[in-house]
Amino acid sequence: MVIEHIRNFSIIAHIDHGKSTLADRLLEFTGTVSSREKQDQFLDKMDLERERGITIKAQTVRLNYRADDGKDYVLNLIDTPGHVDFTYEVSRSLTACEGGLLVVDASQGVEAQTLANVYLALDANLEVFVVLNKIDLPAAEPERVKAEIEEIIGLDTHDAVLASAKEGIGTKDILEEIVKKIPPPQGDPAKPLKALLFDSWYDQYQGVIILVRIVDGVVKKGDKIQLMSNKKTHEVLKAGVFSPEMRETQQLCAGEVGFIIAGIREVADAKVGDTVTLLHNPCDAALAGYKEVKPMVFSGLYPIDTSQYEQLRDALAKLKLNDSSFSYDPETSLALGFGFRCGFLGLLHMEIIQERLEREFNLELITTAPTVVYRVHGTDGSLTTIQSANQLPPTQEIAYVEEPFILASIHVPNDFVGGILALCEEKRGVQREIKYLTPTRVMVVYELPLNEVVLDFYDRLKSITKGYASLDYELLDYRQSELVRLNIMINGEVVDALSLIIHKDKAYYRGRELVSKMKELIPRQMFEIAIQAAVGTKVIARETVKAMRKDVLAKCYGGDITRKRKLLEKQKEGKKRMKNVGNVELPQEAFLAILKVEG
């Protein structure tokens, strides 16, 4: 294959702007998928991806296309995830390309995630051209959207392709533009092997399959390869391309995109962004830009039925095979029993994993409120990182606590700006800028503490804006904050599963809210129950569940007052004794409802 005839490209789009449908049309037009195999969203392999209309893992497919100039080209489509939690994966997938199609819905215009990914593409020096999709819709306004793209992103749109992936309009024009506008890859097959690993997944028969873009050199069956980040070596068992099913080839040359199977046992060994080279003839330096992905959001997962603990453990291990950015450790809670503390890249990642556990493995789970990673500076000069309230040391041992801040850009129609500003202020945000992108769309940029965002920010954002807002965020830094641990106590006993780390100013309101909610949920007992919210030793809110009372005087008709008093005293004694020995069982529904309040 002549390197001048290869084009590597990806499609950049916001969720629901028609990326997967467009990919389907390209597959059909080039005859890669016959109409018999055709199904919607061919590249989205997981049911969950199809259903939620999002791409979670990167996929690649090779298209053979004879252009109008009579030459045969190989087009490698690298399908990238479009969601904010997977930014690092996107940046690596984009590095494997030379160009990109920016797909924008002609009726909706530019959204926050689109922007984030376009900037990633431009940073990677990709040649980006614009495709306006869904032009068949009555609401489509191509001229307005073109002006918006030029204004916001600064891309030239005078020759943007007008298309409708659903109707198949403009598919040929897009393919011609790819051939004309996107440069061929640069690379030298004679140099030592240097390849970028941009995705990997686990296959139960063949071990880990890695997707690579060969930068220099050649790789073939039987070669001994080495991963540069951990220096592990493997022998290549198969190498090939997806067209769109796996097809083994003689070799993969510079400029090509394909897969390698090399008997790698764990996905954790095949890290996205790593450089693959040959053991006996290594390249001199690894590719730039590799970094370890660290979980940002943590949550406890507990099976509702404790007998499902083993199942949950096996299910988590299986998911971990395919997703090295996800982490889990066993933990126990007095209230919820045995479970796991899981780490995720962000909120969407957390939702996806939870949903996959429930759907693919039939587990019923309780999840505790999500938390972030805090840095605790001790009075003795030590620094520890914690993920849950139960790990926070006593107040007297803490010098100060730092929490992560993010830079959030929110795109929203101008009617809702007031509500968004109020929400960000309530969440302790610091305003950076407000920019009118068009007379009707506004970009609001705020610095926000991540722990305020993980609870219910996204849901509130959507409900304030009737679903029209889009959010993108990046991690900024850690900042010192006045954070305290809020404990919920029942009859003086702390319920560990309900403890949370919260800002001092909000502790009272959250405590008030939680105890009043619990008062409704805890069933009455024969003795009274005190529910308290406390910060340190100071109780800041209290509710009491009154005792049920048996009428012990019912059988005394008339009679002496001392007789009645004796019975009442006896009842009082009994209740006192009961209160000392009786413990309150919290019903499961109470937990679920309380965890909802925490949002």
Curated annotation (Swiss-Prot):
CDD domains: EF4_II, EF4_III, LepA, lepA_C. Residues 4-186 form the tr-type G domain. This is Elongation factor 4. It is a peripheral membrane protein. Its EC number is 3.6.5.n1. It is found in: Cell inner membrane. The gene is lepA. GTP binds at residues 16-21, 133-136. Belongs to the TRAFAC class translation factor GTPase superfamily. Classic translation factor GTPase family. LepA subfamily. One of its GO terms (cellular component) is plasma membrane. It holds the Pfam family LepA_C. NCBIfam families: lepA (TIGR01393), small_GTP (TIGR00231). GO terms for biological process: positive regulation of translation. Required for accurate and efficient protein synthesis under certain stress conditions. May act as a fidelity factor of the translation reaction, by catalyzing a one-codon backward translocation of tRNAs on improperly translocated ribosomes. Back-translocation proceeds from a post-translocation (POST) complex to a pre-translocation (PRE) complex, thus giving elongation factor G a second chance to translocate the tRNAs correctly. Binds to ribosomes in a GTP-dependent manner. It catalyses: GTP + H2O = GDP + phosphate + H(+). Keywords: Cell inner membrane, Cell membrane, GTP-binding, Hydrolase, Membrane, Nucleotide-binding, Protein biosynthesis. One of its GO terms (molecular function) is translation elongation factor activity.
